[in-house]
Amino acid sequence: MKKKIFNLLTGMLLSCALAGSTVAVQAEEAGTDTVKSYLTGEDVSVGIGHRRPIAVMLGNDTNGAPQSGTENAGVIYEAPVEGSITRLMAIIEDYDNIPRIGSVRSCRDYFLFYANEYDAIYSHYGQAVYALQYLDQHLIDNLNGLTLGNAYYRSTDRVAPHNAYTDFSHLQAGIQSQGYSQDYKEDYNGHFQFAPEGTETTLDDGVSANVVKLDNFAYNHPWFEYNAETKEYSRFQFNAPHIDQNTGNQLTCENIILQYSNYVPYDPNGYLNVDTQSGGEGKYITRGKAIDIHWTKDSQWGITHYYDSNNQEIQLNPGKTWVEIVLNDSVGSVSLQ
């Protein structure tokens, strides 16, 4: 990680003049022990900001929800898997004091590429066979519950396979047993661009997006509702607020990215080969508005970048982000109000 470009005159994130885009570096202010989070653009302690996050696979059917630890995630991916259900991947940087995280479920190969965009340590319990070609080659640091019994435990309040959980001590045991570095790579400069401090992205030319319905996910039918007072979106699914089981609090976020993606079936069993590299269209949603975007990626293991209609990289508002992977043949089932 190219750590700590600090401007003694401003103590702020450096920014580009073109389109106001923010340079994706962490800035450490004089006399403080905080840096800007790569996940949220908000202040976090130096220890948390320098440590690689975890990217945890979470079940999202009625047996797996509500999940635990989701409220602590800076970024959450939702993507379809076989059987019309979705899986979540929660990317968490500050997991030291979360009572439990889970339930942890198995890997699908496209989630590996999303996790790598954040230089995260990938947490999963088993995998679909199509992911083995990447896991067996150790192309991404990962903690597999099938082979690392010290990284997870089984709870007694749910039945298998919906009762695999982890926490700080278990994750650290797994990470240390594998010898993984917990520091960001030297050349990692973050994923998102965030609005410069003291400003916000308002999408004044966007369309109304006070309610975002994702009926493309026909099993859980999730949606988001915007609260203008808090400037956050509240998440719902299964006709009820989507909560974190640890706290009972409803999940919220400042940013929603709809990433439209091509795919082909792997086999008749419904396993999906989601295209994470070729690019496509989408939406960026914040502050009750939405704009059209397009996304690009220079390699399978690279980082996705999102651009507006003027081909300028979008700037997220600091805070939490949901990335919704929408298959191209189901875009028509997404609605904004």
What are these regions (language model features)?
Residues 2-27:
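Sec-dependent N-terminal signal peptides of Gram-positive bacterial secreted proteins and lipoproteins
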Residues 28-77, 82-337:
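A surface/extracellular/periplasmic glyco- and lipid-processing/surface-interacting theme
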